[in-house]
UniProtKB/Swiss-Prot annotation:
One cellular-component annotation, GO: cytoplasm
Pfam families cross-referenced by the UniProt entry: YgfZ_barrel (PF21130)
UniProt function note: Folate-binding protein involved in regulating the level of ATP-DnaA and in the modification of some tRNAs. It is probably a key factor in regulatory networks that act via tRNA modification, such as initiation of chromosomal replication.
Protein's recorded name: tRNA-modifying protein YgfZ
Keyword Cytoplasm annotated: yes
Record family assignment: Belongs to the tRNA-modifying YgfZ family.
PANTHER family in UniProt: TRANSFERASE CAF17, MITOCHONDRIAL-RELATED
Keywords: Cytoplasm, Folate-binding, tRNA processing
Chain sites annotated for binding folate: 27, 189
Any one of the GO BP annotations: iron-sulfur cluster assembly
Compartment annotation: Cytoplasm
InterPro entries cross-referenced by the UniProt entry: GcvT/YgfZ_C, tRNA-modifying_YgfZ, YgfZ/GcvT, YgfZ/GcvT_CS, YgfZ_barrel
Entry's Gene Ontology molecular function annotations: folic acid binding
Gene name per UniProt: ygfZ
Amino acid sequence: MAFISFPPRHPSSSARLPLTLIALDDWALSTITGVDSEKYIQGQVTADVSQMTEQQHLLAAHCDAKGKMWSTLRLFRERDGFAWIERRSVLEAQLTELKKYAVFSKVVIAPDDERVLLGVAGFQARAALANVFSVLPNSENQVVRDGASTLLWFEHPAERFLLVTDVATANMLTEKLHGEAELNNSQQWLALDIEAGIPAIDAANSGQFIPQATNLQALGGISFKKGCYTGQEMVARAKFRGANKRALWLLAGKASRVPEAGEDLELQMGENWRRTGAILAATQLDDGQLLVQAVMNNDLEAESVFRVRDDANTLHIVPLPYSLEE
């Protein structure tokens, strides 16, 4: 019996979100197993996975030799290796790159389409899950396991949970929460990630940016002390030589359409507008507000005014829940 996804509805901001069960169809799960799995993944991603405990999850980047990101990965340990979650649009290309050197190691790298990814967020999300699971993650133990389920805890923009589970548990949870929770699709989780300043790397932006251009250093996603990994030289140069001039920004406002990933924006310069930046993700909320996640110059004025290209409405900068000061 398959898991049936949920119909779309406009997402809500974290401040107004009722209890919501979210089908994460736009994200995908993959695993690496085998005796060399830790050594192999350590040589491919920006974070230090050797320091990661079973109670932690990490955001890391998988880069090309020039330090440009194929994808960002949400990594956590599993019984005989690691699992990670990334945007489904980049899965195939990212796995192809990751497997390039696997022939020399005792590892198996594969997508996992058997399990289901669900998000639980909004009003009293913890209380709702406490009625279903015997243990829940928190700031101390960000990853817990209960039977067939792995639960990941996220602090921002408000407490929320990501579940990696089997079809039977996903259907059971849907049935249990159906009366009290709203059901929504991936756009709701994306909206929360945009608010949280967690970069969404889809196919249009794969291979375009170094990790620091998407604030990964502020999210604990880059170790400057670990051994070699693909792209390390360029990532280190960006830090120690100040070569990175870009950052991830959150914009909010109005627009007559929702722009696509990979589009640019326009910045107001006196009477004129100048093209700038690259959109990673955008979504329209149920109150009509547009949220945009974009990579732009890191020296923008806080009061800068933007717009979707040729649009009559404007967007402004919203502070992120973390600091870029090093």
